Amino acid sequence: MDWIDPLTTETRLPLIEICVEGIDGLLAAQAAGADRVELCASLVEGGITPSLGTVRAALDQATVPFHVMVRPRGGDFLYSETEYRSMLADVAALRDLGVPGVVFGCLNADGTIDEKRMGELTEAAGPLNVTCHRAFDMTRDPAEALEALIRCKVGRVLTSGQRDSAIEGLPLLADLVRQAGDRIIILGCGGLDLANIAEVRRKTGLAEMHFAALKDVPSTMRYRNPKVGMGGSDLDREYRNTLTDTPLVAATIAAAKA
């Protein structure tokens, strides 16, 4: 499939990207009217790299562009050399598979953008769309971090304005939109929902917005071994599946574009 950047079509702004976990999430988001999808695994960790099988399923079944998370683990964004090499390999493999875009972010220990690694990863991506994820929100100087990403030729940055929610981050989001101009796209995120997405759009001028409308659904497992868990102490978590809520996605998109 030849992927078209939605901003070059008749898409009604703001463009809406839905963050999903796995192929079922992608299918739910596109059915709800998403303009684009961010494809991840393990959203409980903030999103990590999905499996090869998931990516191939997305290539087979997606009808909207999707950008693939490249993040080898949860936690911070200061990666070892071996972790970084795995990211380079993932980006190259995703480029060769023909995905529309990739999402990654690397920081230095002092809270600045790791321009060397970000530049190399962006170069490895070749023609793919490149987004810096919310590693940006962990930088010490957002204005300088934005300029660093522009120098690295990154196409967009995902940010909540360095706060837990876009509502709290409104002033910085508006400043970043002004600073960015037409040099880089600011992709706003952070607790966006049916009640606040129109306000955030109006007060910031964001052309692109990102959210994950999720719901927990009980597992259909009938037998449950109460004596063992697969990690962590919350055994109930292992019998809850987090899914993209298609009606909520559709309603929130409608509110954003009203």
UniProtKB/Swiss-Prot annotation:
Its main location: cytoplasm. GO terms for molecular function: copper ion binding. Keywords: Cytoplasm. The keyword Magnesium does not apply. The keyword Cell division does not apply. It is found in: Cytoplasm. Pfam families: CutC. It comes from the Bacteria. InterPro entries: CutC-like, CutC-like_dom_sf. Belongs to the CutC family. This is PF03932 family protein CutC. It comes from Mesorhizobium japonicum (strain LMG 29417 / CECT 9101 / MAFF 303099). The lineage of its organism: Bacteria, Pseudomonadati, Pseudomonadota, Alphaproteobacteria, Hyphomicrobiales.
